[in-house]
């Protein structure tokens, strides 16, 4: 048996033979029709003529058999991709044949029609294939001997030709508008979403090739398609289609814009996606897909470059963060509830995380409109989003309380404003009955946590930043309006009818000139500001913006004077924190923390909130008042305006102390559970971390300068004993690596030292070197002894020892108080 690749050689020879025969007939017909002999030098050799004969030819000889035979040649793709066979490329792109009616049919048109016919047949018959398109037709070499025609054979071949590395083929394809239009008809196929149906794979394979190889031409065609966004959203559950739409968006780079983002903006992509978040009309799968599309858009539109998949801030994300659509998201949270609520919350969270103003490339507080004219590529300002959310804090709290009341009373029907969601009793592995916390309460708290992150951003705590952002927004709208008017003037209007040069075409420049045009546009805008064409419209100077709006604090930070000063003219960040304080969110979160001891996801969210509060600046914004409310909520209510809680209205929480009612109470409850089950409650890990934050806070700040009451709480005998004894020992015990032994770093150092000592034994050592080695060795021995002593000491400390100390310090103290 020979291993020589005869098949490849014969196949290559087969393609050449087919082409020789085709071109011989082609030239013969051409010569008969024109009676010209000027192209003798291009005619085939005499050997070829003798092989195929020199008899006269007619049009029936130049039939479709040539292209059909070429398609079944196994070396076809290799010739197109690797060998760069120009004759073969010309045959496919420029060649033609005559059909039975003597009509000329171009090979490209024939392949296009054949592909679409097979795709329609696959859709009609519900054809399925377990194979990927990458499985080429080489693996079905015996196909031509079969009686039945497999549509996937030709679908694979033709789609591979269209996706080859041959530039003329791809260029000819992208210029074939009828084919591209017919290819987009697959959106109407019934089986496009069916599992293992190859139609979608063929569509994406061809379109992605055209997008990456002929970006400008392909996008022009894409923009010309009617209702293209609706077509994608109709199949939004098909994730490959959504990913393809994201790839199209990624072509609109800051340095080389394609204006596809503006096109999608005018096609109402954002409102159409948000309209899918309706529980009564759309399934959870559709809602999830809509949310994933918006979050993917946000991820590639961050205000700072994370990776190559980045286009920067744009009109779509700016629109999503605008008051109108933030209100729509809020209404979904409050009134749709359920699955739509979870998707809406995840969208808002992603907006905040990916548009942190602290990472903006251009600092609004240190620039001017003249130096940095506003554009749609400016970082997205989150002030509008945070303000709209803050204005609905009462609604969020009411929903939180309503969900709690639903748990407390299964028959509560008093509140009809919001739909009721009952949580039935469940049983855990310890055979304890419990009512689940619920998805909605977790989502509300997760939203509050992210809003707190947003409120700590620099721009959210600057009145000057708010004014600058508003000015830039107005200026940006004016620039957009001027561009719109200019585009309208350039429209060709005949007999009151707008020609094909539509506003869209005016807005979308050719890809080759986009970068230069973009730079020219920026220079023109900057020149207009300097020439006072737009400068006079807005007061863009910083003279009108008072730096004193950003207030400094007096000592003590927590005082009635400081409270009134902040509340009189709060920043957006302070306004949110004031709402948090007045509504009593923190005591409620911490109470639910203890009530649901096994919901670790909830515990992590609450810990994140508390950690943010204690790590915030105390001399900046309303943070110090939030900390004060954690230590003594009852006293902190004196800072709440009286009209908020009148004489007939009860406070949301009567009193709450984070040390006694949370840290110590949580330890006490866990102690009692440990007595019965010999294990701690599930929240103990996060509770200890919160206690660590309080201890760290007391060491970093002079708490008597913040509020004397806080200092007094931290000097409490029980807290002092707990923080210096139980907390320290818990921290030390938890720092030991699992399985015992020395610390990893120390172990590595000893291993390296032993290796060096063994390596040096074979060499005569210099006296000074020996002295140094002895000193190092002695130090290592001392360090080793100290570590061993520490490990021995820790080895005597167990969970039971800490449990006993909790009893002595906390439990017995509670008993004495009672």
From Swiss-Prot:
Keywords: Cell cycle. GO terms for molecular function: protein phosphatase binding; protein phosphatase regulator activity. Signal peptide: none annotated. It comes from the Eukaryota. Hyperphosphorylated in the absence of SIT4. It holds the Pfam family SAPS. Residues 33-60, 499-526 are annotated as: Disordered. GO terms for cellular component: cytosol; mitochondrion; nucleus. GO terms for biological process: G1/S transition of mitotic cell cycle; regulation of signal transduction. Residues 509-518 have a biased composition (Low complexity). Associates with the SIT4 phosphatase in a cell cycle dependent manner. May be directly or indirectly involved in SIT4-dependent functions in budding and in normal G1 cyclin expression. Belongs to the SAPS family. Present with 279 molecules/cell in log phase SD medium. This is SIT4-associating protein SAP4. It comes from Saccharomyces cerevisiae (strain ATCC 204508 / S288c) (Baker's yeast).
């Amino acid at each position: 048996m020979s291993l020589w690749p005869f098949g490849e050689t014969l196949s290559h020879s087969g393609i050449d033979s087919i082409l020789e025969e085709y071109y011989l007939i082609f030239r013969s017909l051409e010569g008969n029709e024109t009676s010209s002999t000027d192209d003798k030098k291009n005619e085939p050799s005499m050997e070829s003529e003798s092989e195929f004969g020199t008899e006269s030819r007619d049009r029936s000889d130049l039939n479709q058999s040539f292209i059909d035979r070429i398609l079944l040649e196994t070396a076809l793709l290799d010739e197109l991709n690797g060998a760069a066979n120009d004759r073969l490329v010309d045959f496919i792109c420029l060649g033609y044949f005559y059909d039975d009616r003597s009509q000329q049919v171009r090979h490209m048109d024939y392949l296009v029609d054949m592909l679409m016919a097979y795709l329609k047949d696959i859709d009609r018959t519900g054809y399925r294939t377990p194979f990927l398109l990458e499985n080429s037709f080489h693996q079905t070499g015996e196909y031509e001997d079969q009686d039945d025609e497999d549509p996937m054979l030709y679908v694979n071949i033709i789609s591979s030709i269209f996706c080859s590395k041959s530039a003329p083929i791809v260029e000819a394809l992208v210029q074939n508008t009828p084919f591209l239009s017919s290819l987009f008809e697959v959106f109407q196929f019934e089986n496009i979403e069916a599992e293992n149906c190859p139609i979608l794979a063929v569509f994406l394979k061809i379109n992605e090739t055209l997008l990456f190889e002929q970006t400008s031409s392909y996008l022009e065609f894409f923009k010309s398609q009617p209702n293209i966004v609706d077509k994608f959203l109709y199949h939004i559950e098909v994730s490959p289609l959504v990913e393809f739409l994201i790839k199209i968006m990624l072509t609109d780079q800051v340095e080389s814009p394609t204006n596809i983002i503006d096109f999608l903006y005018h096609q109402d992509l954002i409102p159409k996606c948000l309209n899918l978040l309706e529980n009564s009309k759309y399934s959870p799968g559709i809602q999830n897909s809509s949310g994933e599309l918006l979050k993917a858009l946000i991820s590639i539109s961050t205000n700072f470059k994370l990776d190559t998949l980045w286009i920067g801030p744009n009109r779509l994300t700016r629109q999503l963060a605008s008051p109108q659509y933030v209100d729509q998201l809020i209404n979904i949270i409050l009134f749709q509830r359920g699955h739509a609520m979870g998707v809406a919350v995840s969208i808002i969270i992603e907006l905040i995380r990916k548009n942190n103003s602290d990472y903006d490339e251009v600092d609004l507080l240190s620039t001017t409109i003249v130096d940095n004219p506003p554009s749609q590529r400016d970082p997205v300002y989150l002030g509008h989003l945070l303000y709209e959310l803050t204005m609905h804090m009462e609604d969020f709290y009411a929903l939180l309380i309503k969900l709690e009341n639903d748990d407390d009373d299964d028959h509560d029907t008093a509140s009809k404003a919001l739909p009721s969601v009952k949580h039935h009793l469940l049983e855990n592995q310890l055979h304890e009955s419990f009512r689940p916390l619920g998805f909605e309460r977790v989502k509300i708290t997760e939203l509050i946590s992210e809003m707190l992150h947003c409120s700590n951003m620099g721009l959210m705590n600057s009145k000057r930043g708010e004014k600058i952002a508003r000015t830039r927004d107005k200026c940006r709208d004016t620039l957009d309006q001027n561009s719109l008017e200019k585009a309208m003037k350039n429209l060709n209007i005949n007999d009151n009818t707008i020609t094909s040069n539509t506003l869209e075409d005016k807005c979308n420049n050719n890809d080759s000139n986009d970068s230069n045009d973009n730079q020219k546009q920026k220079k023109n805008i900057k020149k207009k500001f300097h020439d006072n064409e737009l400068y006079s419209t807005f007061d863009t100077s910083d003279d009108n913006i008072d730096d004193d709006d950003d207030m400094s604090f007096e000592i003590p930070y927590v005082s009635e004077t400081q409270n009134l000063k902040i509340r009189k003219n709060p920043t957006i960040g302070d306004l949110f924190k004031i709402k948090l304080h007045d509504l009593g969110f923190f005591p409620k979160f911490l109470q639910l923390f203890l009530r649901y001891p096994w919901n670790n996801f909830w515990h992590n969210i609450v810990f994140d909130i508390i950690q943010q509060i204690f790590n915030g600046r105390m001399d900046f914004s309303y943070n110090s008042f939030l900390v004060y409310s954690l230590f003594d909520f009852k006293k902190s209510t004196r800072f709440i305006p009286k009209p908020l809680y009148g004489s007939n209205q009860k406070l949301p929480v009567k009193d709450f102390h984070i040390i006694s009612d949370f840290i110590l109470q949580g330890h006490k409850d866990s102690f009692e559970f440990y007595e019965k089950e010999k294990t701690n409650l599930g929240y103990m890990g996060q509770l200890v971390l919160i206690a660590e934050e309080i201890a760290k806070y007391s060491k970093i700040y002079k708490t008597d300068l913040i509020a004397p009451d806080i200092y007094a709480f931290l000097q409490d005998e029980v807290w002092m004993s707990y923080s210096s004894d139980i907390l320290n020992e818990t921290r030390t015990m938890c720092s030991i690596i699992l399985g015992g032994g020395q610390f990893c770093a120390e172990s590595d150092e000893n291993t390296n030292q032993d290796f060096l000592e063994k390596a040096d034994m074979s060499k005569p050592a210099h006296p000074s070197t020996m002295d140094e080695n002895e000193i190092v060795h002695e130090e290592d021995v001392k360090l080793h002894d100290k570590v061993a002593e520490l490990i021995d000491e820790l080895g005597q400390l167990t969970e039971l020892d800490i449990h006993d100390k909790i009893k002595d310090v906390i439990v017995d103290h509670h008993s004495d108080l009672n």
